[in-house]
A protein has these predicted regions:
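Anion (oxyanion) recognition and catalysis
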Residues: 32, 86-90, 164
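Substrate-recognition "cap/lid" segment bordering the active-site pocket of phosphatases
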Residues: 99-151, 157
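Acidic, Mg2+-coordinating phosphoryl-transfer loop and its flanking beta/alpha structural elements
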Residues: 149-181
Length: 181
């Protein structure tokens, strides 16, 4: 994967989980397999600990464990993301750069890249993995300088705002947890 000699206006920056891949579905199945049940109204909660009636710390540990498991390499596409990513790439020559707070584990990154390639072909030219749950404000400042006015697609409102502050065009993917944004 590389970004050499690409038209900067044909690059779309995107989060992965909750935008391109259906992380929630994979995580829900994994949690159920491990004996955890969601609380009522879970679909409106972003915090995983709250979704499963546990502390935020316990929820974050389980997220990290899931993100570094083999299951992370087999997530399905979110809604119609596969259709539109492939259409933008194949018919309009767009390339995608993924910025995700997945994990710093190299095996997790390998599985993420493999999952994206299997579903999206060669649409993704780079996958940047930050630590599990890491903020994206600093990296978005860097990418806002490199790709000013390019699209930034995300499902977490504060990350959309950080992208806009960095000079990117922010698009929020709708989920129950961000309906009040």
């Amino acid at each position: 994967m590389g970004v050499k000699n690409m038209k900067k206006d044909k690059i779309i920056l995107t989060d992965c989980d909750g935008v391109i891949l259906d992380w929630e579905e994979g995580f829900s199945v994994w949690m159920e397999h491990h004996g955890h049940k969601k609380v009522e109204g879970y679909q409106f909660l972003y915090n995983i600990g709250q979704r499963y009636g546990m502390s935020s710390e316990a929820g974050n540990k389980l997220v990290k464990q899931f993100n570094e498991s083999a299951a992370i390499g087999f997530l399905p596409p979110l809604r119609d993301a596969q259709f539109f990513v492939k259409k933008l790439h194949e018919q309009h020559q767009y390339k995608f750069i993924c910025i995700t707070s997945l994990s710093l584990d190299p095996y997790a990154k390998y599985l993420r890249e493999r999952n994206l390639k299997k579903l999206m072909g060669d649409a993704f030219i780079d996958v940047i993995c930050l630590d599990t749950g890491a903020d994206k404000d600093k990296i978005l400042k860097d990418y806002g300088i490199k790709y000013p006015n390019n699209y930034w697609i995300e499902d977490k409102p504060e990350n959309v705002d950080w992208g806009i502050d960095a000079g990117l065009k922010g698009i929020l993917i709708e989920h129950g947890h961000n309906m009040d944004y």
